[in-house]
């Protein structure tokens, strides 16, 4: 890994590194994710041009995802902090498409598509759930008090 850094984005923890044009070893990613910092994923940042980077994202089990919003925020910050890009407006290329970001000090804002929602509710363990998608699937559950709900 080239210049690896531990980064956190709104509760998700990542190991972020510059992309090395080599085959990714899924087994190593799983070992690193399990043993290092209890991270959610490993992200490689590949320079495309002075305003654009490509994100190579791997979950902690070695699988990939089309979109990881918190990971994209970390990628943009990493790219700016490590002079991979030369602007605080960074485009991150992800499997879902190009995501525009804007960095102001330690805050990274992103533009994502409008979420889609399925109209039919699911009943899971007695809870009404709704499927949503912002590039990757989510399951939404409304509770009276999130702080008292046993996650």
Regions found by a protein language model. Give the residues of each.
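Short, solvent-exposed secondary-structure boundary/capping segments
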Residues: 106-112
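Generic detector of bulky aromatic hydrophobic side chains
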Residues: 53-57, 92, 112, 122, ...
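A glycine-rich beta-to-alpha transition motif near the start of alpha/beta enzyme domains, typified by
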Residues: 1-105, 139-151
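Anionic-ligand binding region
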Residues: 118-132, 139-151
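Zinc-dependent deaminase
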Residues: 95, 115-117
